[in-house]
């Protein structure tokens, strides 16, 4: 089987993972103690388990996942929470002191003490796989552990498991809802370090998700659990085709093949529909056509940027539930007639479809309504460069005064790393500009002939 190991780093990574595993268990009919529910036992055997779960001799399912954090609080909550019986106790690794929102602590001083222990556990989980497909790494850009330790882990995974794909789910610091002053530093340093190690990075921006929760679910003040449950639906949709059967299945490597035209341009924009509250569910038609169109509206996207100003390079539409290929093709045909959706001219068709017949599950007493079909769209668009430019300008403001830099240098980092990381990000922004501009030049060439 094609197994996938999830690695959850730092507070954001661990808490998103909690929501994801809660959802996977519901989808596969696994109880919080790791054993199957009675109705699941009665149904046909499910072979999709083994992608994310390993089975022990006595019929218990254990997630192939590792939690790592430099401070114990978040992981202690998992150790004592409702799902404490599900996870392998040795796969919960926490340190004694945290990274204090400092990339250098996560990457150099504090992180260095924990990394070998984490990699040892990764190796054990990997040895237990018959055909390891790759890693999903969950972390945030803004925190110290997520950025520093997350980057260190990615570097070391590249050394130990060079050819295996590594997909990142990263929480991008939101413009309005910042949790620390040094987020721009951490984000740019971690992006610079992981750029060559990640094959595909799905960014999620807290503010965009706050807005979706407020607007679509009517939550006045969403908390992290509300946000994480929404993120979990997205992660579940992306991984559904690896775990269930469908008519058009998508494999981990297929994501990169279809979404990443150049190795550095690997930050797809994620959109998910329908996000509707239980109260409104009965009044929505929720047709394949409607869902597909709503994915192209900025309101349903997981990062604040406007794709109408950018160009699409590639788009993956992952449907799940009651969707027949015919409907999906019809929806795409309609999309192609829309003038607002512009593709770069060197990538004419650009739509990849995936259909998984397992309908989306909802957490009981959650905010999302139960729907019979959903779609998750992953699109590589040049508009996501807007996210980088906002971050870069904040970085420049602080770095021009060398504010807070002594905390990083004090942990053994060199100041040159800041300017190096900033230059790398500037190069990334230029790469995006060039990709969008290529299509403009192409038009002139045609005119000459």
Curated annotation (Swiss-Prot):
It is found in: Cytoplasm, Cytoskeleton. Its cofactor is Mg(2+). It catalyses: GTP + H2O = GDP + phosphate + H(+). GO terms for molecular function: GTP binding; hydrolase activity; metal ion binding; structural constituent of cytoskeleton. Pfam families: Tubulin, Tubulin_C. The active site is at 254. Keywords: Cytoplasm, Cytoskeleton, GTP-binding, Hydrolase, Magnesium, Metal-binding, Microtubule, Nucleotide-binding. CDD domains: alpha_tubulin. Mg(2+) binds at residue 71. The record marks 449 as: Involved in polymerization. Its EC number is 3.6.5.-. GO terms for cellular component: cytoplasm; microtubule; nucleus; spindle. It comes from the Eukaryota. GTP binds at residues 11, 71, 140, 144-145, 179, 206, 228. Tubulin is the major constituent of microtubules, a cylinder consisting of laterally associated linear protofilaments composed of alpha- and beta-tubulin heterodimers. Microtubules grow by the addition of GTP-tubulin dimers to the microtubule end, where a stabilizing cap forms. Below the cap, tubulin dimers are in GDP-bound state, owing to GTPase activity of alpha-tubulin. PANTHER family: TUBULIN. Belongs to the tubulin family. Dimer of alpha and beta chains. A typical microtubule is a hollow water-filled tube with an outer diameter of 25 nm and an inner diameter of 15 nM. Alpha-beta heterodimers associate head-to-tail to form protofilaments running lengthwise along the microtubule wall with the beta-tubulin subunit facing the microtubule plus end conferring a structural polarity. Microtubules usually have 13 protofilaments but different protofilament numbers can be found in some organisms and specialized cells. This is Tubulin alpha-B chain. It comes from Neurospora crassa (strain ATCC 24698 / 74-OR23-1A / CBS 708.71 / DSM 1257 / FGSC 987).
């Amino acid at each position: 089987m094609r197994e996938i190991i999830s690695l959850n780093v730092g507070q954001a990574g661990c808490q998103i993972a909690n929501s994801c595993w809660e959802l996977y268990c519901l989808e596969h009919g696994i109880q919080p103690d790791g054993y199957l529910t009675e109705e699941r036992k009665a149904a046909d055997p499910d072979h999709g388990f083994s992608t994310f779960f390993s089975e022990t001799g006595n019929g218990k399912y254990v997630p192939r996942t590792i939690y790592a954090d430099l401070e114990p609080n978040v992981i202690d909550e998992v150790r004592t929470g409702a799902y404490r019986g599900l996870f392998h106790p040795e796969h919960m690794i926490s340190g004694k002191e945290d990274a204090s929102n400092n990339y250098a602590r996560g990457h150099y001083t504090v992180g260095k003490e924990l990394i070998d222990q984490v990699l040892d556990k990764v190796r054990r989980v990997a040895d237990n796989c018959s055909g390891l497909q790759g890693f999903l790494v969950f972390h945030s850009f803004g925190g110290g552990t997520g950025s520093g330790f997350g980057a260190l882990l990615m570097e070391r995974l590249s050394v130990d498991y060079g050819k295996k794909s590594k997909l990142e789910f990263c929480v991008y610091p939101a413009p309005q809802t910042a949790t620390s002053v040094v987020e721009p530093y951490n984000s740019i340093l971690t992006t610079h370090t992981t750029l060559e190690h990640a094959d595909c990075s799905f960014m999620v921006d807290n503010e965009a998700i706050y807005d979706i929760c407020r607007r679509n679910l009517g939550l006045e003040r969403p908390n992290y659990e509300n946000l994480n449950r929404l993120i979990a639906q997205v992660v579940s949709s992306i991984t559904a085709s690896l775990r269930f059967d469908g008519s058009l299945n998508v494999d981990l490597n297929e994501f990169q093949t279809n979404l990443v035209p150049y190795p550095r341009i690997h930050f797809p924009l994620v959109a998910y529909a329908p996000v509707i509250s239980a109260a409104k569910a009965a009044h929505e038609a929720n047709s394949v056509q409607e869902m597909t169109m709503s994915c192209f509206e900025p309101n349903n996207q997981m990062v604040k940027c406007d794709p109408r100003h950018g160009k699409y390079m590639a788009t993956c539409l992952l449907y799940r539930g009651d969707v027949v290929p015919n409907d999906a093709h019809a929806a795409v045909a309609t999309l192609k007639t829309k003038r607002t959706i512009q593709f770069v001219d060197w990538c004419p068709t650009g739509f990849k479809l995936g259909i998984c017949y397992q309908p989306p599950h909802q957490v009981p007493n959650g905010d999302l309504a139960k729907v019979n079909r959903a779609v998750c769209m992953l699109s590589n668009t040049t508009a996501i460069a807007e996210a980088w430019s906002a971050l870069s300008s904040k970085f420049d403001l602080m770095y021009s005064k060398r504010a807070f830099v002594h905390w990083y240098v004090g942990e053994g980092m060199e100041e040159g790393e800041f300017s190096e990381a900033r230059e790398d990000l500037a190069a990334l922004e230029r790469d995006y500009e060039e990709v969008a501009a290529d299509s403009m030049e192409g038009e002139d060439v045609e005119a000459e002939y």
